[in-house]
Amino acid sequence: MRVGCPKEIKNHEYRVGLTPASVREYVAHGHDVWVETKAGVGIGADDAAYAAAGAKIAASAKDIFEKCDMIVKVKEPQPAEWAQLRDGQLLYTYLHLAPDPEQTKGLIASGVTAIAYETVTDERGGLPLLAPMSEVAGRLSIQAGATALQKANGGLGVLLGGVPGVLPAKVAVIGGGVVGLHAARMAAGLGADVSILDKSLPRLRQLDDIFAGRIHTRYSSIQALEEEVFSADLIIGAVLIPGAAAPKLVTREMLSGMKKASVIVDVAIDQGGCFETSHATTHSDPTYEVDGVVHYCVANMPGAVPVTSAHALNNATLVHGLALADRGLRAIAEDKHLRNGLNVHKGRITSKPVADALGYEAFAPESVLNVA
């Protein structure tokens, strides 16, 4: 198969879908790999490194989309890329379709077969291709929040860990999944007073065991959520419903009870955000204020640390990527976890959470793949 990796074009996105190490694996499986020139500059991999790994260097993204049967990316295709996708092509990347009707329309119109990293599952019920970026985003959320809390950046002017004789900042983490765990770990490591809210009592017990009393865990009732949000200096939104739009847990009305110049970091913004007042921002313009509360809602947070995140992502995506390149649609038909990753196929939505969020009919992957 001809496998192509275009350069990412989203604002300040420096990751790359294929590292040179991944290219070597595809080539070893007998595939032709095309990489757009300068696609790897953000991770310190030049064209020579890709050529040495066995890739052919394409002069433009147009060449990649025209020549290749399978496109491997990091972020969702941008409008300029939708028009270049075609019927019969495989797209393997993050999609986050539930809050994005325009991208969904573009993928439907193209006829492409689109596999979303964020909905591929594993035997334990986890999301193995989302997990590494959730780990990165969770840790980055605390770095970003700590920076936004500085007075010069519009924040309260508090240090997360405090100093002897001065109380540390209070951090509330909404959601105890992978993002929440890593946000709490980073915040607690800096000495902050951390609370995690979640609706799963088994998960709260796990977190209690992991942190051994270094953080507080609370069942996420309306009252508990209000109490934590109203008293926090930094609030991390870390809620995920796989494939679906994030629930709006913190309303506009609740902002009035929050501390002025407190900070929200909405890691769930890729799925629409879990704060009613959230809208996506960029690394070049990351924050805005609503009712005196600073909002940080960058939709591609791991793109800020591409050397770490691109390699972590490739470690996770390579196995399924090779299966797709080796066996095409048959790989999806034969693997329930890849079928869970299938979001769009030949103009039909195959993810029920996406279909429900956007008002489409959902088709079972098995009913549309037509693999003999």
Feature-to-residue mapping (PLM):
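Glycine/serine-rich phosphate-binding loop and adjoining beta1-alpha1 elements at the start
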Residues: 2, 8, 79-169, 298-300
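An N-terminal-biased, well-structured beta-alpha scaffold segment characteristic
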Residues: 2-110
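Glycine-rich phosphate/diphosphate-binding loop of Rossmann-like nucleotide-binding domains
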Residues: 6-45, 152-240, 287
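Short glycine-/small-residue-rich Rossmann-like dinucleotide-binding loops
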Residues: 69, 75-76, 95-96, 221, ...
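Residue-level detector of alpha-helix initiation sites
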Residues: 76, 136, 177-178
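Adenosine-phosphate binding glycine-rich loop
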Residues: 118-159, 269, 274-372
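Rossmann-like adenosine-cofactor binding region
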Residues: 209-291
